[in-house]
């Protein structure tokens, strides 16, 4: 559960498809790493990002080793996807983001749909992007390790917040994470 100063949202984690990302995220959450951190980047109709520690680098890993992005054709960057950000080398650490790209936004254009179809993307994936929105160009680059199932309106509200020239919210939005096992 993500208890933010803007409200609460909940996500399910995909430990089978993204075991390293889930282990890193849950261990850091259990250690209290994310508690009190702030949302560090907001791009309206794209992402809400957090997980950078006080050093501003977002390089904390529970066991000291960065991990490679975990990609699969089973998980995609649909709106509400909880993702581990990969750096230029393809490695991930503590930074995570939630996709906020909504259906009908400019990210999933008819031209992109046509390109996906021409490239042989599965019809169900293309249809899901049309229905849910998202960022298909991030598939196979960053790790999807969860999906928001409740409180997407909170994520959408955070995505509407005023930001500075670095896309950081002008008013701090703090995070407190609680892990609920079901």
Residue ranges: model-predicted function:
Residues 1-180:
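Cyclophilin-like peptidyl-prolyl cis-trans isomerases
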């Amino acid at each position: 559960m993500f208890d933010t100063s803007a409200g609460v949202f909940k996500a399910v984690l995909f430990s089978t498809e993204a075991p390293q990302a889930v282990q890193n995220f849950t261990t850091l959450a259990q250690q209290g790493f994310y508690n009190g951190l702030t949302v560090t980047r907001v791009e309206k109709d794209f992402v809400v990002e957090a997980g950078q520690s006080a050093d501003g680098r977002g390089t904390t890993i529970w066991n000291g080793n960065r991990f490679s992005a975990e990609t699969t054709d089973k998980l995609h960057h649909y709106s509400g996807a909880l993702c581990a950000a990969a750096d230029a080398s393809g490695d991930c650490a503590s930074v995570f983001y939630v996709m906020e790209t909504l259906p009908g936004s400019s990210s999933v254009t008819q031209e992109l749909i046509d390109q996906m179809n021409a490239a042989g993307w599965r019809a169900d994936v293309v249809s899901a992007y049309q229905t849910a929105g998202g960022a298909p160009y991030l598939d196979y680059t960053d790790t999807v390790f969860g999906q928001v199932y409740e409180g997407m309106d909170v994520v959408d509200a955070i995505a509407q917040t005023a930001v500075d020239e670095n896309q950081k919210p002008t008013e701090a939005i703090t995070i407190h994470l609680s892990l609920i096992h079901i």
